[in-house]
């Protein structure tokens, strides 16, 4: 079984919690850590932006990535949310077993 971390940024903590709860309830992710304040610097519509955001760090099975991506896009307020999948090469056997049990 392959596992991954999915990162996603949101406009605030409330949106991150809303998305995380929905994904956990749907059994698409086992867990989401929410980092409440990060600073993102980027260009959007030819304008340099510097915004405070939240970072969601989600753990799941790699095979569920497409479903997670669809769900995030459905729930998210951004036009183009950051949705990045990072493979987990190694991890605690017990923890990854728990991730497996918590997801569909």
Regions found by a protein language model. Give the residues of each.
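Positively charged, small/polar-rich N-terminal and surface patches that mediate targeting and assembly
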Residues: 1-104
């Amino acid at each position: 079984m392959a596992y991954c971390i999915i990162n996603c940024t949101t406009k605030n903590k409330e949106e991150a919690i809303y998305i995380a709860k929905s994904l956990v309830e749907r059994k698409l992710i086992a867990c989401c850590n929410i980092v409440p304040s990060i600073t993102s610097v980027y260009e959007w519509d030819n304008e340099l932006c510097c915004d405070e955001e939240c970072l969601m760090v989600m753990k799941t099975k790699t095979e569920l990535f497409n479903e997670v991506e669809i769900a995030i896009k459905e729930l998210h307020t951004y036009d183009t949310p950051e949705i990045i999948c990072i493979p987990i090469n190694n991890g605690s056997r017990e923890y990854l077993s728990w991730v497996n049990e918590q997801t569909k």
